[in-house]
């Protein structure tokens, strides 16, 4: 875990709690995403690591973000600038979305298959995972022909390897032990 992630967590939690209270989770997500992209900009990054005062940095950052960030978002940016934490904005955004997904009981699931899956197969996988994980599931599908057949499903810490390659590897391990 990076230092910036540790630094970002309290800011993300504060932004999340405020957005939840005001019923503005999506709006805050968009604001933080925009501000994070500004912070990632090479020229802005040079400015962040330079010797500009916190007040001037906040002023510049708010001006660059313009109307994309409302008054409350600007206040967050000013507080982060005063504490020299604007470089952590991308991590704040990531942590915010993690909290948002947890709140909405949603999880991203990576489904890797040997061939393209049909809509019916995807719906079946999605419904079974929703039941097992007790969350809304967002499937991100990809094809890896080296699997030979079957699928690999990754959802957070859960990994289900039902691929032909995985089965062959497990069989090989069992025979060698």
Swiss-Prot record:
Protein's cellular compartments: Cell inner membrane
Purpose: F(1)F(0) ATP synthase produces ATP from ADP in the presence of a proton or sodium gradient. F-type ATPases consist of two structural domains, F(1) containing the extramembraneous catalytic core and F(0) containing the membrane proton channel, linked together by a central stalk and a peripheral stalk. During catalysis, ATP synthesis in the catalytic domain of F(1) is coupled via a rotary mechanism of the central stalk subunits to proton translocation.
Subunit structure: F-type ATPases have 2 components, F(1) - the catalytic core - and F(0) - the membrane proton channel. F(1) has five subunits: alpha(3), beta(3), gamma(1), delta(1), epsilon(1). F(0) has three main subunits: a(1), b(2) and c(10-14). The alpha and beta chains form an alternating ring which encloses part of the gamma chain. F(1) is attached to F(0) by a central stalk formed by the gamma and epsilon chains, while a peripheral stalk is formed by the delta and b chains.
Gene3D superfamilies attached to this UniProt entry: N-terminal domain of the delta subunit of the F1F0-ATP synthase
UniProt name for this protein: ATP synthase subunit delta
Domain of life, source organism: Bacteria
Gene Ontology terms for molecular function: proton-transporting ATP synthase activity, rotational mechanism
Segments passing through the bilayer: none
Keywords for this protein: ATP synthesis, Cell inner membrane, Cell membrane, CF(1), Hydrogen ion transport, Ion transport, Membrane, Transport
Alphabetical list of Pfam families matching this protein: OSCP (PF00213)
Membrane topology note: Peripheral membrane protein
SUPFAM superfamilies named in the record: N-terminal domain of the delta subunit of the F1F0-ATP synthase
Family indicated by similarity: Belongs to the ATPase delta chain family.
GO CC annotation, single: proton-transporting ATP synthase complex
Signal peptide boundaries: none
């Amino acid at each position: 875990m990076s230092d910036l992630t540790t630094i970002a967590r309290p800011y993300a939690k504060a932004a999340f709690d405020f957005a939840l209270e005001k019923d503005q989770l999506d709006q805050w997500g968009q604001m933080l995403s925009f501000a994070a992209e500004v912070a990632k900009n090479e020229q802005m990054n040079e400015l962040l690591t330079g010797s500009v005062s916190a007040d001037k940095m906040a002023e510049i950052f708010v001006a660059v973000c313009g109307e994309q960030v409302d008054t409350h978002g600007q206040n967050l940016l000013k507080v982060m600038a005063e504490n020299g934490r604007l470089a952590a904005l991308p991590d704040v955004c990531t942590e915010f979305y993690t909290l948002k997904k947890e709140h909405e009981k949603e999880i991203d699931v990576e489904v890797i298959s040997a061939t393209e899956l049909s809509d019916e197969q995807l719906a079946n996988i999605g419904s079974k995972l929703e039941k097992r994980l007790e969350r809304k599931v967002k499937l991100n599908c990809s094809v890896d022909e080296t699997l030979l057949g079957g699928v690999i499903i990754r959802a957070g810490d859960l990994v289900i390897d039902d691929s032909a390659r995985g089965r062959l590897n497990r069989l090989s391990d069992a025979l060698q032990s």
